[in-house]
Amino acid sequence: MENYPQFLLFFILASVVGIVSIAVALSWVLHYREGLGWDGGAAEFNWHPLLMVIGFIFLQGIAIVVYRLPWTWRCSKQMMKLIHAGLHILAFILAVISVVAVFVFHNAKNIPNMYSLHSWVGLAAVVLYPSQIVLGIAVYLIPVTPVRVRAALMPLHIYSGLFIFISVIAAALMGITEKLIFSLKSPAYKDSPPEAVLVNVLGLLIAAFGALVVWIATRSAWKRPREETAQTLSNNTTSPEEIKVGTDMTTTS
């Protein structure tokens, strides 16, 4: 891999920022909000931001870049496809649970649904995401699609995946801001109480994680090498810094 130390730095940063984001989201709902529950009350709503950060942001981000981890190149391409799809499916399951929690809470409290830009963008991402997963499995995981078709569709697959991921980041930033505006009364959001500061930090962490994932996913020098090259790596002890595969990258990794 070219610039392996740089890749490792960005991946470690992304992982740390993502994990810290989850910790901050958990701290927010446990310390400043009503905790977690499943009774139609505010504690049920709190699953929404927490599971969105864990699933729709962190797990989706890791799923996007998992192909590019050099230590996975010793695994078969089919195995990595299964891991890639599995992470996306798990992220989607958590996202669905979080959306259900919101609707149950809103209906229990007679709060209108689907009126804000946050809800529109967020639901659009939730609807598009399974379509991306199903098409990805049909085209790339099930070995029946011609290689030429897979190669032709790969740019669209990559673009739509990143578009959905960025849309989720945008929806999350709108959502946590909306929650603070509605919830903080005395002191108000504009007075910057500790909860507001904490959640603003969460927003910055989410944005930073998204930026790091997109950067890692769009560096052509960090793509997974061709299958035959990856198999060669599994049979030698060449360090990632010494592996030069810039000219051997496929367009379908």
Swiss-Prot record:
Cofactor: heme b
Main location: membrane
Binding residues annotated for L-ascorbate, in chain numbering: 77, 81, 150
Positions bound to heme b 2: 68, 77, 84, 157, 223
CDD domains assigned: Cyt_b561_CYBRD1
Transmembrane segments: 6-30, 46-67, 77-103, 117-142, 150-177, 196-220
Gene Ontology CC annotations of this record: apical plasma membrane; brush border membrane; lysosomal membrane; membrane
Extracellular-side segments: 31-45, 104-116, 178-195
The protein's name: Plasma membrane ascorbate-dependent reductase CYBRD1
PROSITE patterns for this protein: CYTOCHROME_B561 (PS50939)
Biased composition (Polar residues): 230-240
Classification via Pfam families: Cytochrom_B561
Record GO terms (molecular function): identical protein binding; metal ion binding; oxidoreductase activity; transmembrane ascorbate ferrireductase activity; transmembrane monodehydroascorbate reductase activity
Annotated EC: 7.2.1.3
Free-text remark on how the cofactor is bound: Binds 2 heme b groups non-covalently.
